[in-house]
């Protein structure tokens, strides 16, 4: 071994130029590998950020949940955050100019704003209780004026039905075009009053979708949906974000929360939960944020993983 070292050193001294070129080449190669790896990771993070803005920052959504289950879920050691959202309903008014104005009212837990869904605040602040709300900048009052921070708004908020009188669920609302929305009716209204605390841009998040011409109102939920939420198809959801340490085990985590076997969980919406399982789990359905999970390296989407790997190879 000593002889080999001596021969190597002697060879390096005799070929100084080649030695310097070799050392520089090694340094450049190491630097290039570091730069390429950094660019690949940066590109992956950009994709994750974009998907988070579109779908929301969560791992699984529990659809039509019995709110009595929420506190227990939040106490689960694998859950970092749980964000609650419920659709309070819709309202329709005619302003002083004779213009028909439609409104959508959503209530969310206070920690949802900025943590689960990206909502850009133009002025003011986010609401802190169920008597406060933020509204989109297109919001007009009944006298035809744009609303300001500090104004009080009162609306008759009710359930949306299609032209045939059928109550629309979340899927029906997502499939609703603006021209069809104009034919819908609003029934079983309740008068609701809010103090406007802020003005926001219209969110781009798919989970906050409403037909484009509606003004949107976001308030804070008291998380007291009907006890029979599952049977009455009350439109509410709980979005769960697992801790970084347990996120890779999202299937088992979700199975534990719902009281299912991990083998029964799939990476798609489950719309065939039996009545017995509904009572056990306290939900009507569940859906994983599968694209986001795949981008983080946890999901099973081959297409998403292939795109990320291809980008790294191209770079």
Which residues are covered by each model-predicted region?
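N-terminal Sec/SRP start-transfer signal
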Residues: 1-31
